[in-house]
């Protein structure tokens, strides 16, 4: 998560510095939005139902207007989810399992100004998904009254990852001169690695 925050900060800094340097060519727009991704039917890494329905995170976009009607846009998205559970398998034995998913996407594409308040865009790029899971069986033994000792009897870890083509389409609405509302769909991959995402954000037009 720390690396993602650094990437977002760099993305924002570049947006702010590039726009003034080329102000004669047009305006810049920076948006930050809520990002929700629905993963495909992934096999469980921990021997049971993954329990993961959606990954949630953040999306940032920078738009630069080349002319009054045409512009370009870049996008960076990150979403994650973690699920864990513990079940009692005996009088003093337990089974723990967890699954963690991460999704990162980078895209760019053209923007078309449809009207004074509405713009439409389409982008393409790459997305990287990573899933890691772990299981552990352990036993609890009472050493002294009130003190329990946990002893691991079995442990297993596994991970899988996939990089695929990503695409997105959306609109940006200007309810005010410097305010932007961003709504978009994002998809990537196919089969078990197919994802569908939804983005809603707000931003500022420089």
Curated annotation (Swiss-Prot):
Record keywords: Host cell outer membrane, Host membrane, Membrane, Signal, Transmembrane, Transmembrane beta strand
InterPro entries: Bact_OM_Invasion-Related, Enterovir_OMP, OMP/PagP_b-brl
Pfam family, one: Ail_Lom
SUPFAM superfamilies linked: OMPA-like
GO cellular component terms listed in the entry, alphabetical order: host cell plasma membrane; host outer membrane; membrane
Membrane topology field: Multi-pass membrane protein
Compartment(s): Host cell outer membrane
PANTHER family: OUTER MEMBRANE PROTEIN PAGN, OUTER MEMBRANE PROTEIN PAGN-RELATED
Function: Incorporated into the outer membrane of the host during infection. Lom is expressed during lysogeny in E.coli.
Family to which the UniProt record says this protein belongs: Belongs to the outer membrane OOP (TC 1.B.6) superfamily. Ail family.
Protein name according to UniProt: Outer membrane protein lom
Biological classification of the source: Viruses, Duplodnaviria, Heunggongvirae, Uroviricota, Caudoviricetes
Protein encoded by which gene: lom
């Amino acid at each position: 998560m720390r690396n993602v925050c650094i990437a977002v900060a760099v993305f924002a800094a570049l947006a702010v510095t590039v726009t003034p340097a080329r102000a004669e060519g047009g305006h810049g727009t920076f948006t930050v939005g809520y990002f929700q991704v629905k993963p495909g039917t992934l096999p469980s890494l921990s021997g049971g139902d993954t329990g993961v329905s959606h990954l949630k995170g953040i999306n940032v976009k920078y738009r630069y207007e080349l002319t009054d009607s045409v512009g370009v846009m870049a996008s960076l998205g990150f979403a994650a989810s973690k699920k864990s559970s513990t079940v009692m398998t005996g009088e003093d034995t337990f089974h723990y399992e967890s699954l963690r998913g991460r999704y990162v996407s980078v895209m760019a594409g053209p923007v078309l100004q449809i009207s004074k308040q509405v713009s439409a865009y389409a982008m393409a790029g790459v997305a990287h998904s990573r899933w890691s899971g772990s299981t552990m069986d352990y036993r609890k033994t009472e050493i002294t009254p009130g003190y329990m000792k946990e002893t691991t009897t079995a442990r297993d870890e596994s991970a899988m990852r996939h990089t695929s083509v990503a695409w997105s389409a959306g609109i940006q609405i200007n309810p005010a001169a410097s305010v932007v509302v961003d709504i978009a769909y994002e998809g990537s991959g196919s089969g078990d690695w197919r994802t569908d995402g939804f983005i809603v954000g707000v931003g500022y037009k420089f």
